[in-house]
Structures are given as structure tokens and as C-alpha cells.
């Protein structure tokens, strides 16, 4: 460009006008991006050369994971594993509500003076076993995977 001008000045000239309510409402009206894409381009379907919403040009969904369908076009259901034999729900075996008791939980927190050191010092000691107890204080089976 030369002589002190920048490329941005040539592309987008600056308008020095006073900011009024009219210019603010105009700016807010024309800069809202909340309008749905279907209202902005009604003929953007696949017949008009557009794309389905959520689909890319190569037919993949927009998240990049190919959709798996059965030969009949029905989506494959996810395989679910039966984990009842591994760890039965103790609530279904007992009649009362359960509480968890953690043995050996010790928490020490020392707060330093803000002028000396603005940090907290936290020490947490937790034992490995967490035992579940029902209302009558009976210990139920531990479920350890």
C-alpha cells in the first residue's frame, strides 16, 4: 500500500459516526447468529446441492464417527453386558437404606496466615476398605472388582 496505510484500511473503511440507539439496534439485528440455518437458506437441502443437517460431504455424521447400521437400515443396538453376577446391587438384597462407613478417614488442613504464605496445606489419609452397612449396623459384602 505504501505511505502509512494498512491493508485493513483499504478493505474495510472506517465510518466515524456517533453511536446512537438506532445504530445499536441495527448492529444487534444484523449480527445475531441465533437464526436457524433453515430460515437463512430454505433451499439448502440435498436436492439443491446442500447437505443434511449434521452430515458432512462424505456421508459421515458431523462428529466424525461413521454411523453403523444393519443391512436393513436399522441401527445396531449396543451390546450390553450383564454385571449382576459380578457385583449384585446390595440395595436389592437388604430391606433398609444403606449408609457407607469409612474407617480411618483423617483430614488435616492447616491454613497459613495470608501475609506469610498464601497457600493451604492439606493432608488426607484414607484406608483401602470402605464397608457398607445397613440400618441395623450389619456389614454387607464388599463389592471389589
Swiss-Prot record:
<dbReference type="Pfam" id="PF06989">
    <property type="entry name" value="BAALC_N"/>
</dbReference>
<dbReference type="GO" id="GO:0014069">
    <property type="term" value="C:postsynaptic density"/>
</dbReference>
<dbReference type="GO" id="GO:0043005">
    <property type="term" value="C:neuron projection"/>
</dbReference>
<keyword id="KW-0771">Synaptosome</keyword>
<keyword id="KW-0963">Cytoplasm</keyword>
<feature type="region of interest" description="Interaction with CAMK2A">
    <location>
        <begin position="3"/>
        <end position="35"/>
    </location>
</feature>
<keyword id="KW-0472">Membrane</keyword>
<feature type="lipid moiety-binding region" description="S-palmitoyl cysteine">
    <location>
        <position position="3"/>
    </location>
</feature>
<keyword id="KW-0449">Lipoprotein</keyword>
<feature type="compositionally biased region" description="Basic and acidic residues">
    <location>
        <begin position="109"/>
        <end position="119"/>
    </location>
</feature>
<keyword id="KW-0519">Myristate</keyword>
<comment type="subunit">
    <text>Interacts with CAMK2A.</text>
</comment>
<dbReference type="GO" id="GO:0005829">
    <property type="term" value="C:cytosol"/>
</dbReference>
<feature type="lipid moiety-binding region" description="N-myristoyl glycine">
    <location>
        <position position="2"/>
    </location>
</feature>
<dbReference type="GO" id="GO:0045121">
    <property type="term" value="C:membrane raft"/>
</dbReference>
<feature type="compositionally biased region" description="Polar residues">
    <location>
        <begin position="83"/>
        <end position="108"/>
    </location>
</feature>
<comment type="function">
    <text>May play a synaptic role at the postsynaptic lipid rafts possibly through interaction with CAMK2A.</text>
</comment>
<feature type="region of interest" description="Disordered">
    <location>
        <begin position="27"/>
        <end position="119"/>
    </location>
</feature>
<keyword id="KW-0564">Palmitate</keyword>
<keyword id="KW-0770">Synapse</keyword>
<dbReference type="GO" id="GO:0016528">
    <property type="term" value="C:sarcoplasm"/>
</dbReference>
<dbReference type="GO" id="GO:0005737">
    <property type="term" value="C:cytoplasm"/>
</dbReference>
<dbReference type="GO" id="GO:0005654">
    <property type="term" value="C:nucleoplasm"/>
</dbReference>
<feature type="compositionally biased region" description="Low complexity">
    <location>
        <begin position="32"/>
        <end position="46"/>
    </location>
</feature>
<dbReference type="InterPro" id="IPR009728">
    <property type="entry name" value="BAALC"/>
</dbReference>
<protein>
    <recommendedName>
        <fullName>Brain and acute leukemia cytoplasmic protein</fullName>
    </recommendedName>
</protein>
